[in-house]
Amino acid sequence: MKQKQWITVAIITMALTLTSCGTIKKSANTVGATTTPVTTTEKVEASKDFISIEEAIDMVENPEKIASITKKYGYKLKENYEIYRLDKFSKMYYKNCRLAKILTAGKYEDYPKPLQKGVSSYVAFQDGAVIIGVFNQSAYDNLVAQVKAASFVLDMPGNEDVYKKDNRTIGCNEGLKTVRVQ
C-alpha cells in the first residue's frame, strides 16, 4: 500500500514538473516595420586639465597653433622623444609627468610616467597624428565621450576602437588610455 502511494506521488510530481517547465511562445508578425538605430549625443564638457578632442583636431589641421594650445594647459616640451625600439615622436608635451629613464643617447625606456599629484597627461606628435595619453580611467572616459559627442561614428571596434567622421579618423585605445587623432 505504501509503495503504491510513493509511486503515485512520484508520477504526479513528474507530471507537474514536465507540464510546468514549458514556456508560452508568442510570435508576432511585423510587416513592413524597419528599425533604424538612433544615436543620441549628449553635450560633454571637456576637462580643463588636458587638451580636448576639438583642440587636438585643430592642432592636426593648423600646426601653428600647437605652441599656444599646449602653453594654455601648462605642458612642457621634449623634442625628438624616442622610446627604445618602439616609438619615435617629433614632439612630446607632458604635464604632471616625469620622463622615463634614458637608456642611450636620446632614447627613453618608456612613455612618460604619471606623478601622484594632479591629472597627468601627455600629447605626442607622430607622422601627422596627435596622440593624447592620460593615466586615469575618468580622464580617458571624458576623451571618448568627447569623440562620441563630436558625431564620430564607431567604424572598427577592437583593441583600438576606430571612430570616423568625413575624412578624420580617431583611434581610442583603452588599454593604453590613449586617443590618436589623424
Say what each PLM segment does.
Residues 93-160:
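Long, charged/polar, surface-exposed segments that mediate recognition or autoinhibition
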Residues 81-98, 160-168:
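Ser/Thr-rich, low-complexity intrinsically disordered terminal regions
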Residues 58-79, 136-156:
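Amphipathic alpha-helical segments
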Residues 17-20:
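C-terminal motif of bacterial Sec signal peptides marking the signal peptidase cleavage site
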Residues 1-10:
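Bacterial N-terminal signal peptides that target proteins for export
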Residues 29-53:
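Post-signal peptide N-terminal segment of mature Sec-exported envelope proteins
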Residues 157-175, 179-181:
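Short, exposed beta-strand-loop hairpins at the edges of beta-sheets
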Residues 22-25:
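Bacterial signal peptide processing site
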